[in-house]
């Protein structure tokens, strides 16, 4: 695996320059999703003053032929700022700016799933949909193996690593802690973190977030993770099954509720939503990974705390079901449910939009309904 040698450079020397005053100028790093639907790209511009809201940020452009988003003969793409965060790498007053991508004709790029998701969220804003997403990922070393694994073998079997403590159980905690603090600084709604079942696999949780902000916060949290890993010389992968065999895959379990579900006797609305989901399983499978279900097919086998990709199931406290109702929700008869099907490399805009379409807009069938503007 070819990796940059940047992590070996002397960070102390860099800090000499990073501590220099920057006057009234502000560095804004524009971030966008590339043509793969998974990769992130970024570039920085100088602003004359600190923007107070995303509306104060200017549009920009980039070469879409170099990001799998256009042909070279007509390659200019537009970057339209959508969400703004504090920059944990350059620190205040500098900014991270998540952008939507538009083509030369001002139509959204194929991987700009935020655009439609925003329209769908606006249609149900009175129901106050909340989301929380549990992002699993695997740390990979420069040798192509999971971080800390033997180059020519495997660690001990799964069991002691989940929420594990100790040098023989926790692989890469420094990266996890750095990412956590960077997210807090940025204003990302990170709710927690833990070591996962497979060694070198970790999870962080984002939420609760209402509506479109779920996707904004998760994508920026992913960007921050990649940048932290860049500094450490380690790679974070969201592949849903990075290691074949008797090892857990990586998902992005999605917790969902509406105002009605969170209030007294909300379990009724939770059960109604699950019934709707049961009739639209294949539509959701296609929406839950960037390859239309092909990535998830390696993960959703019915083993390693997953359901089978071909079957829909639901149950209380059942981590082998498509949909899990937490035990406390069953006892209190209100709260939320967890959709365990999304893959680790899902687009959160696609996942949350699909849940709204099926559960709140009562769509049926294998294709999303096309609403008029």
Swiss-Prot record:
Record note on what altering residue 14 to R does: Decreased glutamine-induced acetylation. Decreased ubiquitination and decreased proteasomal degradation
GO biological process: angiogenesis; cell population proliferation; cellular response to starvation; glutamate catabolic process; glutamine biosynthetic process; intracellular ammonium homeostasis; positive regulation of erythrocyte differentiation; protein palmitoylation
Cellular compartments annotated: Cytoplasm, Cytosol; Microsome; Mitochondrion; Cell membrane
InterPro entries: Gln_synt_N, Gln_synt_N_sf, Gln_synth/guanido_kin_cat_dom, Gln_synth_cat_dom, Gln_synth_gly_rich_site, Gln_synth_N_conserv_site, Glutamine_Synthetase
Annotated L-glutamate binding sites: 246-247, 319, 340
Induction line: By glucocorticoids. Vitamin D and the Wnt signaling pathway inhibit its expression and activity. Glutamine synthase (GS) levels are regulated by a negative feedback mechanism where elevated glutamine levels stimulate GS ubiquitin-mediated proteasomal degradation.
Residue(s) carrying N-acetylthreonine: 2
Outcome of swapping residue 14 to A: Increased ubiquitination and increased proteasomal degradation
Residue positions binding Mn(2+) 1: 134, 253, 338
Residues that, per the record, bind Mn(2+) 2: 136, 196, 203
N6-acetyllysine: residues bearing it: 11, 14
Binding site for ADP: 336-338
Residue ranges constituting the GS catalytic domain according to the UniProt record: 113-373
Regulation: Glutamine synthetase activity is inhibited by methionine sulfoximine (MSO).
Post-translational modification: Acetylated by EP300/p300; acetylation is stimulated by increased glutamine levels and promotes ubiquitin-mediated proteasomal degradation. Palmitoylated; undergoes autopalmitoylation.
Cofactor(s) the protein requires to work: Mg(2+); Mn(2+)
Membrane protein topology class: Lipid-anchor
Modified residues (Phosphotyrosine): 104
Signal peptide: none
Record disease entry: Glutamine deficiency, congenital: An autosomal recessive disorder characterized by variable brain malformations, encephalopathy, severe developmental delay, seizures, and decreased glutamine levels in bodily fluids. Death in early infancy may occur.
Name of the featured protein: Glutamine synthetase
């Amino acid at each position: 695996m070819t990796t940059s040698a940047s992590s070996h450079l002397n960070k102390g020397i860099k800090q000499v320059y990073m501590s220099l005053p920057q006057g009234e100028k502000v560095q804004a790093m524009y971030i966008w999703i590339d043509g793969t639907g998974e990769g992130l790209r970024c570039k920085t511009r100088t602003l004359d003053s600190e923007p107070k809201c995303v509306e104060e940020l200017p549009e920009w452009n980039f070469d879409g032929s170099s990001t799998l988003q256009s042909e070279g003969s007509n390659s200019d793409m537009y970057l339209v700022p959508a969400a703004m965060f504090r920059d944990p790498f350059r620190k205040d007053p500098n900014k991270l700016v998540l952008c939507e991508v538009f083509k030369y004709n001002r139509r959204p790029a194929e991987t700009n799933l935020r655009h439609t998701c925003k329209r769908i969220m606006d249609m149900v804003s009175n129901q106050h949909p909340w989301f929380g997403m549990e992002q699993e990922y695997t740390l990979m070393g420069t040798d192509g193996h999971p971080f800390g694994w033997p180059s020519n073998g495997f660690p001990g079997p799964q069991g002691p690593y989940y929420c594990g403590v100790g040098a023989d159980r926790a692989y890469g905690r420094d990266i996890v802690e750095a990412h956590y603090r960077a997210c807090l600084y940025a204003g990302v709604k990170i709710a927690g973190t833990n070591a996962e079942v497979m060694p070198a696999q970790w999870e962080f949780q984002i939420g609760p977030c209402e509506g479109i902000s779920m996707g904004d916060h998760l994508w920026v949290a992913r960007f921050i993770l990649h940048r932290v890993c860049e500094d450490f010389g380690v790679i974070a992968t969201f592949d849903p099954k990075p290691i074949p065999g008797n090892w857990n895959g990586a998902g992005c379990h999605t917790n969902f509720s509406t105002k009605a579900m969170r209030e007294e006797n909300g379990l009724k609305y939770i059960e109604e939503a699950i019934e709707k989901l049961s009739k639209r399983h294949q539509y959701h499978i296609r929406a839950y990974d960037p390859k239309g279900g092909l990535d998830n097919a390696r993960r959703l086998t019915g083993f390693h705390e997953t359901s089978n990709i071909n079957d829909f199931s639901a149950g209380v406290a059942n981590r082998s079901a498509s949909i899990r109702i937490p035990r406390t929700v069953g006892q209190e008869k209100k709260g939320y449910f967890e959709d365990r099907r999304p893959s680790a490399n899902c687009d959160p805009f696609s996942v949350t939009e699909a849940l709204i379409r099926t559960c709140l807009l009562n769509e049926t069938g294998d294709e999303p309904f096309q609403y008029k503007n």
